[in-house]
Regions:
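Beta/coil-rich, acidic/histidine-enriched accessory regions frequently appended to metallopeptidases
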Residues: 21-38, 43, 51, 58-59, ...
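Register position in tetratricopeptide repeats
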Residues: 38-39, 72-73, 106, 140
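Residue-level recognition of tetratricopeptide repeat
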Residues: 59, 93, 127-128
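Juxtacatalytic substrate-recognition/specificity segment
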Residues: 146-258, 269-277, 283-308, 312, ...
Length: 357
């Protein structure tokens, strides 16, 4: 028996290099693809895996790589297709199943995401993170099942009980005001109703896992913790306008948008008044360097976040003042289509970014 195992091992050891000899180019492409994933370079990874798959279309690992590349580029539908393909070829590729669940969740298909994680946790009972994610999603599904909905022409607002019905009606009115204020400014009018969910603070932290300073979140659904917003109508307007702007930005560009531009536009269009932002930067001594504001702000402490939002808002306010909302919207469209930031900026703002800021 030991000998047989030994022989089987030998066969495996021999098989790997033999395969590489048959297709060294494929092995090299795959290596390039994984290196690009590690470096966060979605486009380069997508290209490498696409070429590798052309020669070896039934390789589950290559489909996993192609899916990860698509995830990095925020092409969630493509990522879903690739992870599903990987799992058809190799049902035990648990990494693909974990990523498929995440992408389904991002696409708003909570029930399918839950089903995927039920299979994942049955296959890998030792995976505590997957178990915790599954439980969180189940709590979200239970909560959403319990919720009622207020339907407007551009938004649907979900809320938990009759006590929140009045607030939901106020939220709908506030969202409609934001729609007719910000839509014309950017020249964007989403046709499909945007889902909005009102949470308690605890539900909000649990479901979005946002930092404690966050007043709202947008991930395809506008999610807002209502406590506190209740007593102050202006705060409700501010938070909903901010998250609605994120929804507009998503319709213009689902990817490639630097965080300072995304958050800056949402913050600049909250109320229009940016005196607080100037004040914030004066107090901090300096604006935040934009290169530190390219990706998510979730890692910042409350004070760092304030300067990050203030800086972003002031930069985007200047863009709006100089070139107008439609030019900023066109810049976002170009970025979403994969354009290089500096060239797109020069084209739409009529001067180089370096000269601008
Ligand atoms: Zn935001």
């Amino acid at each position: 028996m030991a000998r047989l195992v030994g022989l089987a091992m030998m066969a495996l050891l021999v098989a790997a290099p033999a395969r590489a000899q048959i297709d060294p180019r494929g092995a090299l492409l795959e290596r390039t693809g994984w290196d690009a994933i590690t470096a966060g370079q979605g486009a380069a990874a997508a290209k490498a895996f696409r070429e590798a798959l052309a020669a070896d279309p039934k390789n589950a690992r290559l489909h996993l790589g192609a899916g990860l590349a698509a995830t990095l580029e925020r092409r969630d539908e493509d990522a879903k297709d690739e992870f599903e393909r990987a799992l058809v070829l190799d049902a035990k590729l648990t990494r693909a199943r974990a990523l498929l669940g995440e992408v389904l969740y991002r696409l708003g298909d909570l029930s399918e995401a839950i089903r995927t994680y039920e299979t994942l946790t049955a296959d890998s009972p030792e995976d505590r993170d997957a178990q915790a994610t599954l439980e969180r999603w189940r709590r979200e599904a239970d909560l959403h099942d319990r919720m009622q909905r207020a339907i407007g022409s551009h938004f649907t607002v979900s809320f938990e009980g009759p006590a929140e019905a009045e607030l939901a009606a106020q939220a709908l009115e506030s969202l409609d005001r934001a729609y007719w204020r910000i839509g014309p400014l950017l020249g964007v009018y989403p046709s499909d109703p945007i889902p909005v969910v009102l949470y308690t603070s605890e539900q909000f932290r649990d479901i979005t896992r946002s930092p404690s300073w966050a007043a709202g979140a947008y991930d395809g659904t506008i999610r807002v913790p209502m406590r506190g917003a209740l007593d102050k109508g202006t705060e409700l307007d501010r938070v909903l306008a901010h998250e609605f702007t994120h929804a507009l930005i998503r319709t213009l560009a689902s990817r490639n948008v630097p965080t300072w531009l995304n958050e800056g536009l949402a913050t600049a269009l909250e109320t229009g008044d940016l005196d607080w932002a100037q004040q914030q930067i004066r107090e901090a001594g300096a604006a935040a360097p934009l290169r530190a504001l390219q990706s998510g702000f979730g890692r910042f402490t409350g004070d760092q976040a304030k300067v990050a939002y203030a800086t972003s808002a002031i930069v985007v306010r200047r863009m709006l003042d100089e070139a107008g909302g439609v030019a900023v919207a066109n810049l976002l469209r170009d970025l979403g289509e994969g354009a290089d930031f500096n060239s797109a900026f020069l084209h739409r703002m009529q001067r180089s970014f370096e000269e601008f800021w």
